A protein has these predicted regions:
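Structured alpha/beta or helical-core interaction and ligand-binding surfaces enriched in interleaved
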Residues: 1-149, 154-178
Length: 178
């Protein structure tokens, strides 16, 4: 996780919350770490399969969470969708413009698979930034592309951690660090 993002999360949110970092990039050491961005795929800097494997892992991660909890989202566009290069180059996705424009900036319950798929891709491709609330497990997923932080009232149980670690690298932050 980017240290600046981590410190921002640390300073904004309640210190009593349990924190987990997640990332679709499953690297062995910090030297091996390389973030995967849709923009890099569009620019030809990463392989199509590498990008889509990471995006599919992220979507499966969100889909799994939606099976164990109600899902609410709140997001804002990083740039207007008319000017968003990643959005304009997402012709492989059948977005409902009415849905994504209506829900932008609003706390919205996701009620079907189509909405969940769209929201997952908006986050994965860094078209939006925001958070996903999982009320049944009292947790919030803060996304920055296909990585971010899970803030939880309680420790996530080992079965849940095991299931989501099949899709993303997940690591508990044991103590607040500078």
């Amino acid at each position: 996780q980017n240290p600046i993002e981590f410190n921002k999360i640390k300073n904004i949110y309640n210190a009593k919350l349990v924190r987990y970092l997640f990332d679709t990039e499953k690297y062995q050491s910090e030297e091996d770490y390389r973030e995967i961005f849709f923009q890099e795929y569009l620019d030809g800097k990463i392989d199509k399969n590498e990008y889509y494997n990471a995006e599919n892992s992220f979507k499966e991660f969100i889909k799994y969470l939606s099976r164990i909890s109600n899902v609410y989202v709140c997001y804002d566009f990083l740039a207007s969708i008319e000017n968003s290069y990643p959005f304009q180059n997402s012709s492989d996705v059948n977005f409902s413009l009415d849905f994504i424009k209506e829900t932008q900036g609003k706390f919205t319950k996701i009620i079907d698979k189509f909405q969940l798929e769209q929201v997952s891709i908006l986050f994965a491709r860094e078209i939006v930034c925001g958070f996903i609330v999982l009320d049944d497990i009292k947790s919030v997923v803060i996304c920055s592309g296909m990585h971010g932080c899970i803030l939880s009232v309680n420790d996530l149980d080992s079965e849940l951690l095991s299931a989501i670690s099949l899709q993303v690298k997940v690591e508990k932050i044991s103590a607040l660090q500078n």
